[in-house]
């Protein structure tokens, strides 16, 4: 009898929830909201994200349009999938959408938004961005690390030359190069060869790609605890803070003459030279931004560029011809040579178009109600810009939008530095990535040296997945399988 009563109560609860859900759905249809696919009770549209959300959301946008409203649990999410719609959000109404939503994972790792990429829109964010734009990633600062880039590229070339008769794990070589450059620039020394550092970075990258159920359905937050996410967050945040604190303290105890980001930020903290105070937590958060924003995404672009070139040997041949013609009898490619390499820049653009390192840009959040293309967007709406979908939009790129064809950029005005929303791998507007020049110059000079020094081919025993463009899961999307190649 008791069991029967419990079953009846459970059924009544389910019926009541379903009735309330459909009533709310009906009310929502009367408001002037963007088109939205049908939602399930409680989780709403969460089940439609799939293994690769950028692909799933792109497919949904073909049916519901470039401005599409989803609900992840209790959170309204506006998905933007076209260049015109992105212009409305990132340019026309840039200020309204300039903030960032809170996230359990990001808050725990990035010191509750003390960094630049994830800080809420406001005075603190403006101050930290000015430090990055005017100092850390200024053209002068980027040029000052030219020798670091050249030294690490020379070491990479020598390593490849020694292994020239063997199958080379190009993915591993590229990630090691990127790690070494960024560690030297940001921290003043290499850490990439240390197993504990590599493990820390792998755990960080993996965790940033996790999905926190509790961030969207608060009453299901216990699921994050059950599956170990909360424990992993505590562990990784403590390990990262311990590592960064040790690095900063080593600089404090040193002679103060290192030319790296930590030393520069400590000088600002000590001398108060920028008109506002910067503390130890802010320093650690900004350095963490450099690792997350540059390390994984930079090597990912290089990996995809070499993948596409090996898949399209006519493009590889053309790039190689250009690089060798510009450099002629030089032993290597210098950064001064890059300005004359138009096809190289086209290859970088085309790779960014088809394989933006962050297919779904870091989410934005509306701070006020706003009218967007006759749709009402309330304050507190999360906004996801699908850079992957925008880069493959046939209306912009033509019927061959899915094909790798660098030639399309040779006479094109479209650029990736924020002026044109047809190509937004680094974002646009107020929240555009401040480190574009820092990342792109490394990508260009590495790729140019790779094709200048060696003739590349796939191993004879290469299986189909070597040239497959299957993607990994996570925040930054790289190849599912490592890229192996040989030099001839």
UniProtKB/Swiss-Prot annotation:
UniProt-annotated binding residues for heme: 433
Cofactor: heme
Keywords attached to this entry: Heme, Iron, Membrane, Metal-binding, Monooxygenase, Oxidoreductase, Transmembrane, Transmembrane helix
Signal peptide: none
Membrane protein topology class: Single-pass membrane protein
EC number(s) reported in the record: 1.14.-.-
Gene Ontology MF annotations: heme binding; iron ion binding; monooxygenase activity; oxidoreductase activity, acting on paired donors, with incorporation or reduction of molecular oxygen
PROSITE patterns: CYTOCHROME_P450 (PS00086)
InterPro entries noted in UniProt: Cyt_P450 (IPR001128), Cyt_P450_CS (IPR017972), Cyt_P450_E_grp-I (IPR002401), Cyt_P450_sf (IPR036396)
Domain of life the protein comes from: Eukaryota
Transmembrane segments: 3-23
Classification via SUPFAM superfamilies: Cytochrome P450
Subcellular location as annotated: Membrane
A Pfam family assignment: p450
Cellular component, GO annotation: membrane
Family as reported in the entry's similarity comment: Belongs to the cytochrome P450 family.
Protein name: Cytochrome P450 71A24
Origin species: Arabidopsis thaliana
Taxonomic classification: Eukaryota, Viridiplantae, Streptophyta, Embryophyta, Tracheophyta
Gene (UniProt): CYP71A24
